[in-house]
């Protein structure tokens, strides 16, 4: 039996997991799972206490994407029935921010489909973010695709705090998921974001026929990229996508993955993201002993659980919602 608490203390002392130790976490016997999570919580609590960060997505532009990502219902190769619309207007983005403020959401995430944003779309986001900051004081994360340096600079100047661009999978597995852009394209966008002074957010999707070695490589790559926030998605296979029917995950393995990302990225915000409800199922609360952040509400094209259920879960766990909008901000009608 591995001593997971000892390993956790070593991590807190600066130890970086070896590949052997990382794979052992993913291969942790189910009867040791609670001990593994105890170690993960020891690390989590050292940096984040019992606080949980809440995030909410607005799908600002849906469908119409030319990329061929195998997991995505909005891609060019998907036949899934999804709503398609161009970038929403500023007023729609503001209404979403007002709802996020009411729900004590810490980070409001503006997400748009497509390979990358047009300058006109950047104009819309920039205008909205300036007013969101003035009225609500929320942290804003943008996720608009592959970004040019001048676009990143404009977002930073407008007040965007964070930019999300996921690596999604390992470098070696990436060509099995999409061929319309490269893994290096994604990494370059994360580097562009960092150079602009934006906080980098980059994560993964688990359950896309990758190996455990791939999962370890993902966690290590994100450590090397120094992503401040790491969303861990679990594949919600959608009919009409190339990965439809893929069902490799169970709740216990998902918890081991979350623990791995905590042990390998101890100081970072680890977020349980898409697919939480369908893959963790009744074990969702245990995930927050490793992670310290969740999405509330719906995702891009799939539904989340009722918001009230998430707030009840946090109350039952005894966790505190981290919500600190800028003190000068206030809702104006």
Curated annotation (Swiss-Prot):
Pathway: Cofactor biosynthesis; biotin biosynthesis; biotin from 7,8-diaminononanoate: step 2/2. The keyword Iron applies. One of its GO terms (biological process) is biotin biosynthetic process. GO terms for molecular function: 2 iron, 2 sulfur cluster binding; 4 iron, 4 sulfur cluster binding; biotin synthase activity; iron ion binding. SMART domains: BATS, Elp3. CDD domains: Radical_SAM. Its EC number is 2.8.1.6. InterPro entries: Aldolase_TIM, BATS_dom, Biotin_synth/BioAB, Biotin_synthase, Elp3/MiaA/NifB-like_rSAM, rSAM. This is Biotin synthase. Binds 1 [4Fe-4S] cluster. The cluster is coordinated with 3 cysteines and an exchangeable S-adenosyl-L-methionine. Coiled coil: none annotated. The gene is bioB. It comes from Geobacillus kaustophilus (strain HTA426). Residues 47-273 form the Radical SAM core domain. It catalyses: (4R,5S)-dethiobiotin + (sulfur carrier)-SH + 2 reduced [2Fe-2S]-[ferredoxin] + 2 S-adenosyl-L-methionine = (sulfur carrier)-H + biotin + 2 5'-deoxyadenosine + 2 L-methionine + 2 oxidized [2Fe-2S]-[ferredoxin]. The lineage of its organism: Bacteria, Bacillati, Bacillota, Bacilli, Bacillales. Pfam families: BATS, Radical_SAM.
